[in-house]
Regions:
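Accessory interaction regions appended to the cores of large information-processing enzymes
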Residues: 1-159
């Protein structure tokens, strides 16, 4: 039973990503001398876990990073627009050593290719640092898309 549940958690019923912070309680079970074996218990556990997990109304979490961007004042508007398009939450701005320091929180997924984008926007005159901050809920519209994409991928693999 445990192996079936752990396998299901590793593959994640919603998007194929690891399911964390899950508590499972088995209330009842019977063993039949002919039909019971390790595989049947594992498959039953996987099926039960998947059904219960989806009924529990799970939410998808994404890693959020603290981002600090050091940018010349001339490029501040372009950099802020780019960050807002990446779902960043601007936390503040300061002036530091002739540069503007922009502080934000941003989903890790949105940092893909950020270095290239920032260099392109500023002619290579800006830099940034990141640090893991927390896990936050994915917005519901993005969660729905992630689930739909995963289901489509499963259907494609089944063909």
């Amino acid at each position: 039973i445990l192996k079936g549940i752990m396998d299901c958690m590793e593959q994640g019923p919603l998007t194929g990503s690891y399911a964390r912070d899950v508590r499972v309680i088995v209330y009842d079970g019977k063993m039949h001398p002919v039909d019971s074996n390790e595989l049947s218990f594992m498959l039953a556990a996987r099926h039960a876990f998947s059904d219960a997990f989806k009924q529990a109304g799970p939410k998808i979490l994404e890693p959020i990073y603290d981002l600090e961007v050091y940018v010349p004042a001339d490029y501040m508007g372009d950099v802020m627009s780019d960050l807002q398009g990446r779902r960043a939450l601007i936390m503040g701005m300061d002036s530091e050593a002739g540069y503007q320091k922009l502080s934000a929180k941003i989903p890790l997924k949105e940092l893909a290719n950020y270095s290239i984008s920032l260099s392109s926007l500023t002619g290579g005159r800006a830099s940034f640092t990141t640090k893991f901050a927390s896990y936050e809920l994915v917005p519901s519209d993005i969660q729905s898309k992630l689930i739909a994409d995963h289901e489509a991928e499963l259907e494609k693999d089944a063909e």
